[in-house]
Amino acid sequence: MNIKFITIKVKNLEESINFYKEILGLKDIRRINPMGGTKIAFLEDKNSGTIELIENEEISKTYDVSKESMVSIGFEVKNINEKIDELKNKKINIIRGPIEVPGGSKLAFIKDPNGIEIEFIEENR
């Protein structure tokens, strides 16, 4: 069994697409408008799964994803310090890290435009 995709409800689809493409390097593979007021984009990582971003005009007016969501997304990186430098060069705020955890793995955290926590993990191998 493999994870096919992760769905995230977003406030602004275009802003979210740009973040996931420009900051995280995901590829925009498909967009659909299945019904009035709903827009969906699928983005993928070349090595793993797909992220589905959904903007719904009615939900966006009342739903505060940053307060109600328990979603976080983790990406494995080869070098946490290089990733932190890359993010800082793109003017992205590092909210925590680098943190070394028992076992030697290193972590750093940012947030996407919707308040979703993004974790970068350098595994100790």
Where are the regions that the model predicts?
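N-terminal beta-strand motif that seeds the catalytic metal site of vicinal oxygen chelate
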Residues: 1-17, 70-73, 124
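Core segments of cupin and vicinal oxygen chelate
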Residues: 8-50
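Hydrophobic side chains in well-ordered alpha-helices
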Residues: 16-19, 83-87
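Vicinal oxygen chelate
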Residues: 31, 42, 84-125
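Exposed loop/turn and edge beta-strand positions of beta-sandwich/beta-sheet ligand-binding modules
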Residues: 37, 69, 104
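A short, acidic/glycine-rich surface segment
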Residues: 38-39, 58-63, 96
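Acetyl-CoA-dependent GNAT
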Residues: 55-59, 122-125
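Mid-chain, well-packed structural core segment of small domains
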Residues: 72-84
